[in-house]
Amino acid sequence: MLNTITDFLGKVDNFVWGLPLIILILATGVFLTVRLRGLQIIRFPLAIRYMFSSDEEDGSGEVSSFAALCTALSATIGTGNIVGVATAIVSGGPGALFWMWMAAIVGTATKYAECLLAVKYRVVEKDGHIIGGPFYYIENGMGKQFRWLAKIFAVFGIMVGLFGIGTFTQINGITSAVGNFFDADIVHYINLFGRDYSITIVISGIILTVFVALVLIGGLKRISNVAQVVVPFMAIVYVLVVLIILGLNITKIPAALIEIVEGAFGLRAFGGGMFGAMIVAMQKGIARGIFSNEAGLGSAPIAAAAAQSKEEVRQGLISMLGTFIDTIIICTMTGLSIVITGAWDMGLEGVAVTTKAFQMGLPFPDKVAAFILMICLVFFAFTTILGWDYYSEKCLEYIIGNKPKAITAYRWIYIACIFIGPYMTVQAVWTIADICNGLMAIPNLIALIALSGVVVSETNSFFERGVHKQLK
């Protein structure tokens, strides 16, 4: 029965993530990059200045621009950076990392465009509550006749929250890391649903479910406040630890980069296998890249819409940094540590791959290395769970309106999915996540192409008015 379900999910995943979606994702990013004249590269220094600027705009919104970025990062920096990269390299080879880079480079323009549109088309309700995201720029930008497309996006957004990035993958990654540290050999186990599970996985799953249930009482400002403190801290800690691995293995990095590029184009395969190997590397790399940085997925615009910014371009520039931080920095470092240590080719899966890379690359006892990774993963994944509850609630609100009782009921369903996550296989949770992500991205990418003229017009107006020169 389990094999039948796994096979079915695999077929659906291959269908959703076929060449059409891969082309759509890359083509949208390239199209926007060309129309914006490489803005993500040329205006990158300005984006950095805006991110650290204390000169906040007095615009309508619920949180600061930096807080909106941190809210988005709290949802994007999660298991995708640690476990997702590992699963991509194990499934698609080292070349998958190359395609993650390509998707991120053009995806930065995609992230800029979607967050700009989110601020432009956001709605202020009578009580002053700010709502926005792809559903609003689809409806208000493309026209009321496309409200059906906005609703499809919202439905898929709920699916990603309940079954993808928001719950299953995060809790599964956390409990697996806890299990690897406390009971790697599953000495203490309990039989549930016909399978043996480590007691530590069961207990940690229950504890984390309870913690999430308690935290979800808060709203956006609470999530933003927590994110501003936790996200930068955990990112710095993780980067420093991986830098140690790369520093101690610096002589192996050139060979690893060659292996990544060769793997990206199937150069180590022969004959017709070259094309097949390249497609698999592209599929896994881009899919995990979307999972990790969420560029084009349509989630970051929901957070960006709440920013206290009257200039859409300013928020777009700040928000696009999320893709750079997430993929170009954090995912790259994880991927390189996995490739240079050879952990990807040892028959392991999921968090065990990254754990092995840490144990092989750090000058610490194995238990210490596993503990460091476990702590990082707990922080990464926990904030992602909170961020995606917010995203998926906004999707639900778009469909049914602001109904507190329905939202409360949804939160209980969300919590129930978190409770279930630890007992699913690594392959199942990541396959389901990929399927949901692909479906959610399609309507958003269509909207970005349709509204690209608006993005270009707003961008040109911003720089022609010299607004960027007013930055102190």
Give the role of each language-model region:
Residues 38-65, 87-89, 93-97, 101, ...:
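Flexible loop linkers connecting adjacent transmembrane helices
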Residues 24-31, 36-48, 171-178, 199-249, ...:
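Membrane-interface loop-to-helix entry segments
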Residues 218, 225-228, 233-305, 356:
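Membrane-embedded translocation segments of transport machinery
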Residues 1-79, 89-96, 107, 419, ...:
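N-terminal alpha-helical transmembrane segments of multi-pass membrane transport
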Residues 58-91, 117-141, 152-155, 159, ...:
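Alpha-helical membrane segments and immediately flanking helix-loop junctions
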Residues 28, 32-33, 74, 103-128, ...:
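Helix-loop-helix module between adjacent transmembrane segments
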Residues 33, 114-122, 126, 242-259, ...:
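Extracellular/periplasmic helix-exit of transmembrane alpha-helices
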Residues 4-5, 35-40, 80-85, 161-174, ...:
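Transmembrane helix-loop junctions in multi-pass membrane proteins
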